[in-house]
């Protein structure tokens, strides 16, 4: 069951990437910012879900590293998938933004853990 949230979340990403003409706001500038922040949030969550699933189902050292790498790999394949969707196109910039979101999420959780361990 540890992998169910990962599968659901990855499926949601895939479904959204398959939608042509995805816009959220009438203002193009605001829409751009919202979409890029959305990329960061979505892949940050994916990295954390992967971390959790790996930590509970494997004996791998540093599962956060693997979760981060797998989230970035999924970001790259997600952009490749968009090459086959009408009106969408793959973007290395988006892969970088997705990777940044995954990295920020993982780093934030690691920082919180470090700060908590210092208090006790």
Predicted features along the sequence, with ranges:
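Lipid-exposed faces of alpha-helical membrane segments in multi-pass integral membrane proteins
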Residues: 4-15, 44, 69-73, 77, ...
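Short helix-capping/hinge motifs at transmembrane helix termini and TM-loop junctions
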Residues: 19-20, 55, 86, 113
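Membrane-interfacial alpha-helical segments at the cytosolic side of multi-pass membrane proteins
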Residues: 42-56, 102-113
